[in-house]
């Protein structure tokens, strides 16, 4: 039985914190071969994929509020007396699942994924890129036979990035379509879905969101988000600024007023505490011109954009329009889409972002095995777009997780899948060499490191600056 989420069930935000790269967060074309249709609900099975693709590199190996009382508990301790399942140190109590038998039933024939996405609305164009990458990776795996013969069927439903529609989609996916896992975009949809999917013991795998509340494995054991943890990225941002301004600096924040933007802003402010950096102004970026004016008036040295994929270009352009050139502009990882910087022109020169994805358009990576695999699988015109790469990565993480579950003693079951998702140290082919996706029974690290990239207006590309910066906490 699906439950009402109550007053804390979801975060209302008009835009998704989209995956670029990142995400970064910073996306649904119609076709007969796995694309989402134009109707609000469409099914896209990628079983009939191209017959030949290279083998995948790498073997399988915050909103506050009370916790969800109905969600099955998880721990990394010894097995409890109630029915449960454990592997790799992670344990879930299946006795509290809405359908305990379903949680441990071995999946054969087809593995169904229910994808609630904004196929319409203001962010649909960006989501198209991510879904192109996602579909291509799934299709390539199906063409090779799937997961030990089990094909992956991705079914899409439009939520227009409205939490209530995402929740309605979830109900259909679980009760009518009987999917094996879910995925979605954005903080609002994740919040709308988390309670019910945990009660149903249906994994939510690699959703484009990073709300601190749903990173609490003890309360949301079946929810796995994709985007970098806000506190980890904020520590990176503060480190970059301190390196350039060892004697301190005045920082201004251009803050998107969604849950995603406010979450980034709060994490950044928390990371700045105890340093010699002063937060001198926080300006809503709803009106970029007003934000730029406020930041200039505050006389800040550094501008940090706490926002989503579509924010960074307009903020930089607004700064240029009023003749304000900060000494440094730091953008979040979800602003790695180069098209926004090209549109901003010379004003974007020198902007800094953290990245973790390889750039398939970089000539220096032409012979990279991961890039070669990616380009062989993704044939759409947007294949060099960072957001497309991020979508591909989300699917690749899912595939690696399913392979790992299938090879485990628990097998390809809902329990086996979430156990595998909580036991990852995976160097996906499109992660920058040296970066891994890391997850343990007690903590979702996600991306283990970032690399600093600086935008060059002259070459219209990002240029790497220095080596990897570890954010895993080790």
Describe the residue ranges of each PLM region.
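Segments of small-molecule ligand-sensing domains
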Residues: 378, 384-388, 399-461
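Extracytoplasmic "Venus flytrap"
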Residues: 90, 94-135, 157-163, 187, ...
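Beta-alpha junction/loop-to-helix N-cap segments that form part of ligand/metal-binding clefts
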Residues: 125-132, 144-216, 226, 283-289
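Periplasmic-binding protein-like
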Residues: 173-187, 203-207, 251-255, 279, ...
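Bacterial lipoprotein signal-peptidase II cleavage site
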Residues: 25-39
């Amino acid at each position: 039985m699906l439950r009402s989420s109550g007053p804390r069930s979801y975060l209302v935000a008009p835009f998704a914190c989209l995956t670029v790269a990142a995400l970064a967060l910073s996306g649904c074309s119609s076709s007969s071969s796995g694309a989402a249709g134009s109707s609000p609900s469409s099914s896209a099975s990628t079983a009939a994929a191209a017959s030949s693709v290279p083998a995948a590199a790498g073997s399988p190996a915050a909103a506050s509020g009370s916790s969800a009382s109905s969600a099955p508990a998880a721990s990394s301790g010894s097995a409890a007396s109630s029915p449960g399942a454990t592997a790799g140190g992670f344990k879930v109590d299946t006795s509290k699942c809405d359908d305990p038998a379903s949680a441990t039933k071995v999946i054969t024939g087809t593995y169904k994924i229910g994808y609630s996405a904004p196929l319409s609305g203001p962010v649909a164009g960006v989501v198209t890129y991510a879904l192109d990458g996602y579909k291509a990776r799934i299709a390539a795996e199906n063409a090779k036979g799937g997961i030990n013969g089990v094909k992956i069927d991705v079914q899409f439903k439009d939520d227009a990035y409205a939490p209530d529609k995402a929740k309605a989609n979830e109900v259909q996916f679980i009760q009518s379509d009987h999917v094996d896992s879910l995925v979605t975009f954005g903080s609002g949809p994740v919040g709308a879905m988390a309670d019910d999917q945990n009660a149903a013991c249906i994994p939510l795998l690699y959703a484009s969101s990073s709300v601190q509340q749903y990173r609490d494995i003890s309360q949301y054991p079946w929810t796995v988000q994709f985007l970098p943890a806000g506190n980890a990225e904020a520590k990176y941002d503060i480190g970059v600024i301190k390196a350039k301004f060892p004697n301190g600096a005045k920082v201004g924040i251009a803050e998107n007023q969604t849950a995603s933007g406010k979450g980034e802003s709060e994490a950044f402010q928390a990371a700045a505490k105890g340093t010699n950096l002063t937060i001198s102004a926080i300006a809503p970026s709803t009106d970029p011109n007003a934000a730029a004016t406020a930041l200039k008036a505050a006389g800040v040295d550094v501008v940090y954009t706490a926002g989503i994929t579509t924010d960074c270009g307009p903020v930089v352009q607004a700064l240029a329009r009023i003749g304000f050139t900060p000494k440094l502009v730091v953008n979040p990882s979800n602003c790695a889409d180069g098209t926004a910087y090209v549109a901003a022109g010379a004003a974007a020169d020198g902007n800094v972002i953290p990245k973790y994805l390889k750039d398939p358009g970089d000539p220096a990576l032409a012979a990279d095995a991961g890039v070669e695999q990616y380009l062989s699988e993704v044939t759409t015109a947007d294949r060099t777009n960072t957001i497309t790469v991020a979508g591909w990565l989300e699917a690749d993480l899912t595939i690696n997780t399913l392979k790992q579950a299938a090879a485990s003693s628990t097998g390809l079951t809902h329990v086996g899948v979430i156990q595998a998702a909580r036991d990852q140290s995976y160097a996906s082919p499109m992660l920058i060499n040296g970066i891994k996706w890391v997850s343990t029974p007690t903590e979702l690290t996600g991306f283990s490191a970032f690399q600093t990239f600086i935008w060059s207006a002259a070459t219209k590309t990002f240029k790497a600056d220095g080596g990897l910066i570890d954010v895993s906490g080790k």
